[in-house]
Amino acid sequence: MNTPFHSLPSMDDSSIRDLADAICRVWQEFPRDEFSNKIRQKKAEEIEERAKECECLDSSSHAKLVADQLLTCLPPSIPQALKILTDCLPSPQKNSGETPNYSWVWPIATFIREYADEFWEETMAAIHKLCQCGNAEYAIRPMLKLFPQKTMQRLLQWCEDPSARVRRFCCEVCRLRAPWASRLELPRHLVIPILLALKYDGHSIVQDSVARHLADLGKTDESWLLNLMREWWGTGNTNAQAIARKALRGWIKEGNAEAYSILEIKPLDIERTAVFVTPRQVGFGEEVKAKLELTGEFAKGTRLLVHWVVHYPRDGRVPFRKVYHGEEIELDEDSIAYVCEKTFCMTPYSTKRLVPGPHRLEVQINGRTIAEAEFCLLDRRGEKKNSEAGSAIEA
């Protein structure tokens, strides 16, 4: 997946030199030394000013500073400046979800966003090339706000582009609830044609983006999403079904019966279940291992979708419910038993604060909670107690 622009690290002097060198290769009149010196001067002034307010120079501000200097050092004609900047871009990347570390490309995206919105055709051509070698999501935002109809129409045409990065871009930039940017106010009827155009796309990075987009829309209109995914699944097309499976992931984790029905995953006839947890008491930084055993008559072709649910306690609040994907299998022969395991690492980090005390573990199969157990996180980090064989709780 493309790295969100706001999370990219600030550019160093080497990146500025790379940008200047790239421009000089296509426009020899570029004042390389003046450009670099102005950036160093402006950067020092900006850092000093922000220090008074205890703020730092983030990557977006740094890119804006460089883009401002591009405006003064390139020809005053914006279309001509855009031509120079797009000509100096790296070659299009392979159809991978990862964006190479071309940090010197970021100010070009900022230049397009800040100064090129009056030149729609030239800007769209620049964005088409930029999205194949860097992050162009922010660059197109002004066009979506100022010219939504014709910009969305151009994106719809790009949905047939041979580059998967371009096709993914078409879907990603019009997400109304994208986590990497402010909410985009676009009528849903402008967005839906993009999703339908990519319905049968076979590339994983495109499928992932379409699925995320559908899931976003489903948060405000669940019945619409479920009905549409039932239609897509019913086509029998493996690509449309792959997107539907990914789009419904959140509903599957919550045990939504209709989502399981759409994916044709049926409840199991289980005679006996047992979940073993080892150890029952664990310290910070240690691991908890869980083992599930099922007994029943499972016919060949039976599909099993396993999720592990941990209820993490929180100080004075309702425990946080975290769903972990286990495994999804289809039995290749008749069976009377099924066993699976999962390991949980009890190490806290920035997005996972752990509170000592009892933790409840549930096992969910095909949308139904079929077993549960409990383990305790000790309040003395590193201490190990009762690490021998765990106990079993039958459902």
Q: In which residue ranges do the predicted regions lie?
A:
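Beta-strand-rich binding/interaction modules
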Residues: 286-295, 299-315
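Short glycine/proline/serine/threonine-rich loop/turn segments at secondary-structure transition edges
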Residues: 348-358
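A beta-strand/beta-hairpin structural motif
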Residues: 290, 322-349, 377
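Short beta-strand and strand-turn-strand segments in soluble, beta-rich domains
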Residues: 270-273, 315-328
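Surface beta-strand/loop "capping" patches
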Residues: 260-297
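Surface-facing alpha-helical segments and adjacent helix-coil boundary elements at the starts of domains
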Residues: 1-259, 282-283, 300-303
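Short acidic/polar inter-strand loop motif in beta-rich domains
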Residues: 348-350, 364-373
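Short beta-strand elements
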Residues: 368-385
